[in-house]
């Protein structure tokens, strides 16, 4: 992407197994879902990329969530290769500026898991050595993050990185506790 320098990976159209049988209530049931083909960023947005967005748009570097009286994260001052932190509104604005959109939860889950029913990008067994794990480096102690793309053993079947661990990632749709059970079987876009 010429605006932010991000590399994208292609996730082809098709079915995948969404959810799980023995998970939290809002992750069940496991169902086959069809998702159209889409591009997704190979890594989470970095601080360096987010700074380009702030400069180009004149937005403040403080995370503000409408109706939330607290500052949830510090201003953008961390090292450029760490993941950027922001509100859902910031993430949506960033994606629009970069010429894309936030993925739906179904798109994100397919990009992370692939089509063979695995639970994690690397397979179905939890492996702390493959997760984009938290570090305790003095520089990022308070945030507990690591630079993006530094856990290649956790690469998804489509080549996306850091889709298990490090930071939570925003998706386009809103949350509903029964949505995995109630969602349409083709291109679910989230609850109303």
Feature locations, PLM:
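Short, compositionally biased
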Residues: 1-63, 88-89, 116, 123-125
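Functional-site microenvironments in short loops/helix caps that host divalent-cation chemistry
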Residues: 11, 17, 21-22, 60, ...
């Amino acid at each position: 992407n010429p605006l932010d320098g991000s590399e994208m990976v292609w996730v082809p159209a098709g079915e995948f197994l969404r959810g799980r049988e023995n998970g939290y209530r809002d992750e069940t049931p496991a169902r086959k879902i069809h998702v159209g083909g889409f591009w997704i960023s190979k890594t989470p947005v970095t601080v360096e990329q987010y700074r380009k967005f702030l400069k180009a748009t004149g937005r403040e570097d403080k995370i503000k969530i409408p109706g939330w009286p607290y500052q949830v994260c510090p201003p953008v001052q961390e090292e450029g290769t760490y993941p950027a932190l922001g509100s859902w509104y910031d993430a949506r604005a960033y994606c629009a500026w970069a010429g894309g959109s936030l993925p739906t939860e179904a798109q994100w889950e397919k990009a992370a898991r692939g089509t063979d029913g695995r639970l994690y990008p690397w397979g179905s067994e939890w492996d702390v050595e493959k997760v984009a794990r938290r570090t305790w480096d003095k520089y990022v102690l308070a945030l507990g993050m690591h630079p993006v793309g530094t856990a290649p053993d956790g690469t998804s079947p489509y080549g996306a990185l850091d889709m298990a661990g490090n930071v939570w990632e925003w998706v386009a749709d809103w949350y509903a506790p029964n949505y995995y059970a109630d969602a349409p079987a083709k291109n679910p876009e989230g609850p109303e």
